[in-house]
């Protein structure tokens, strides 16, 4: 279950603020995940509408009663499962091919059973051992059976379909609300080529049933696969490129030193500045521009405090909207 909770009163929050009188606390994201031993996937608990604050922990597909497993899980892809088999020194390096494997901050879950992996121990490995691990990986990666992972993905989608329909409908209705006071000429999607901005693009496009302008912030440091995806994406979407053609990242590193927590020049030079220039060219006479960002509150403690709608602190005349919110 994913819901917004008031950290002061520990009650569910429907909007952006607690309903208790005088409480201005920002809601935090609360996630509850259960494990279905029958379907072998994590399941988001659902609200029981009959009983206030009661959560249902039954799998909607098989009806199995599920046990609490974690607050946050990420699927482990086939390549990582092979690497885990090597690190756990399994005799059969493809032993996890058919296993549903998930990762949390505290360890890995193999068909719901937790096993811990010492990152500290891995980081202290001699380079020679790492080379041997890489050799084993390279010898076996082509023999991975992906059918188990593909089947798991389908089971996960089926078991959590109700939840995704719910949050998708909420997000689309929220986005459509901005269409009442803004035209398509006043808005754009900030597109990075990542999964979050892709989902945001899909939501915005479905909300308005029309093509919306996308701006791709080219930092010049993107992976080749990102540029390839951007080119494919641009065939069906209007994508503009915001790029600083005058500066070179490596050269600036030589001149002023690499960017760090105390000297964060990279975003200003290669992202904010380039996007500001593009906005001035595309939205010349616009007083305010609406921007849909692919940012999720659950990504970090700092982002959990972001308002869903806010004025950009870096780019003038820009209103930023977090379309996904709790997705």
Please report, for each region that a protein language model flagged, where it lies by residue.
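Nucleotide-activated chemistry modules centered on ATP-dependent adenylation/adenylyltransferase
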Residues: 1-190, 195-327
């Amino acid at each position: 279950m994913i819901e917004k909770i008031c950290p002061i009163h520990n009650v569910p929050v429907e909007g952006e603020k607690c309903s208790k009188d005088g409480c201005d606390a920002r809601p935090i994201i609360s996630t509850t995940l259960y494990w279905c031993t029958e379907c072998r996937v994590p399941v988001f608990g659902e609200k029981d509408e009959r009983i206030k604050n009661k959560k249902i922990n039954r799998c909607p597909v098989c009806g199995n009663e599920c046990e609490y497993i974690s607050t946050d899980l990420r699927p482990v892809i086939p390549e990582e499962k092979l690497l885990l088999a090597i690190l756990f020194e399994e005799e059969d390096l493809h032993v996890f091919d058919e296993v549903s494997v998930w990762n949390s901050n505290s360890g890995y879950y193999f068909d719901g059973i937790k096993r811990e992996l010492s990152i500290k121990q891995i980081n202290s490995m001699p380079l020679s051992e790492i080379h041997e691990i890489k050799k084993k990986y390279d010898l076996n990666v082509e023999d991975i059976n992906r059918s188990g992972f593909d089947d798991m993905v389908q089971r996960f989608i089926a078991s959590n379909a109700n939840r995704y329909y719910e949050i998708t409908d909420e997000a689309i209705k929220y986005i459509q609300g901005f269409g009442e006071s803004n035209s398509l000429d006043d808005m754009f999607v900030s597109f990075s080529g990542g999964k979050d901005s892709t989902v945001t693009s899909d939501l915005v496009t479905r909300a308005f049933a029309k093509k919306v302008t996308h701006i791709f912030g080219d930092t010049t440091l993107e992976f080749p696969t990102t540029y390839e995806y951007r080119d494919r994406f641009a065939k069906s979407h209007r994508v503009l490129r915001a790029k600083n053609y005058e500066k070179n990242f490596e050269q600036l590193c030589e001149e002023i030193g690499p960017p760090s927590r105390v000297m964060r020049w990279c975003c200003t030079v290669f992202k904010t500045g380039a996007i500001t220039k593009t906005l001035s060219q595309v939205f010349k006479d616009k007083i305010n521009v609406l921007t849909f960002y692919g940012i999720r509150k659950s990504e970090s403690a700092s982002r959990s405090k972001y308002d869903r709608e806010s004025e950009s602190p870096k780019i003038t005349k820009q209103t930023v909207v977090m379309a996904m919110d709790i997705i």
